[in-house]
Amino acid sequence: MFSGSMDILVIESPNGILKSSSFHVRFGSLKVIKSKEQIIEIFVNSKKTPITMQLSSSGDAYFIYDELSNNADSKKKKSFFPTSDQLKQLNLNQGHNEICFISRSSISGIQTLKSSIYLWPSSSKIVISDVDGTITRSDVLGQVLPFLGRDWTHDGVTDLFTKIKKQGYKLIYLTARAIGQSSMTKKYLDTLIQEENILPPGPLFMSPDGIFTSLKREVIEKKPHLLKIPMLTEIKNLFPEGVEPFYAGFGNRETDAIAYRYLNIPLNYIFLIDTSSKVLRLGESKKGSYKDISEKIDEIFPAIDNSENNEINQ
């Protein structure tokens, strides 16, 4: 089992309550060590926090809470979610933060996993982008060719997403790749450059499953929406009741459209791109390109007031 950690999104409500997406952290090489022997330390922006996680025998990290049963005896409850008070103790900056999970073991030594953790206000408007087939030009080849030195990216994607960000929207990235591929995938997104434009920063959400399970769902069964719908539902549930945070979605399959419609993204704000880089805006018959959307940026993605924190996406 491979090690990896997923990016995290924290949403701050007007009442000051913080809610986060799952803390998916996996130390694959430590799965044989008993969980009671392993405490995972958490550092944010290079500073140690008072919050810790505990390692299970499978290598997954959890938060542990005391839970009272009917007979008043205390039971231990495992969770991937910290409380609002715990999130506040992380002392997050608005926007992007670096989070490190550190395991110290006499057997395996010191092991570190790094991810990004974002703090956004509940007024945020989010644009979703799939990675494989949407940023890359192929679901499968897009995972391999960039690491062989070949560009396999749709033309104009970094320029378009940069303009969307400048209009005040936040971007999140989705992939059905396994958490064990997190470092490789983040490196690809972070180093992607087209005509001096890079992809705007934003959390990357992945499959918490193993590589073979993830590949089976993505490539063989072709049902990635079975992952993306609960993933996006979890993100939506971070927002106050009644808030619709998702503004638009980019994908490359009908299953992406199914997931986006399930989350109430309007039909004409769902964009599907094919392997020849032609983009269909659902509800229209004529295909265009990422460049065509860029030229209509003010019409399709009108500027929104981002005065709460104009560095929120940094």
Regions found by a protein language model. Give the residues of each.
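A compositional signature for long Ser/Thr(±Pro)-rich, low-complexity
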Residues: 107-110, 135, 142
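Short, surface-exposed secondary-structure junctions/capping segments
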Residues: 64-72, 129-138
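Low-complexity, Pro/Ser/Thr- and charge-rich linker/hinge segments at domain boundaries
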Residues: 117-133
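C-terminal cap/substrate-recognition subdomain and adjoining C-terminal extension
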Residues: 41, 48, 129, 140-148, ...
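A generic structural signal for short, solvent-exposed coil/turn residues
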Residues: 17, 34, 109, 121, ...
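Conserved beta-strand elements of beta-rich interaction domains across eukaryotes
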Residues: 15, 30-32, 47-49, 56, ...
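Conserved short N-terminal element of RNA/RNP-binding modules in eukaryotic RBPs
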Residues: 28, 173-174
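Intrinsically disordered, serine/threonine/proline
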Residues: 1-119, 312-314
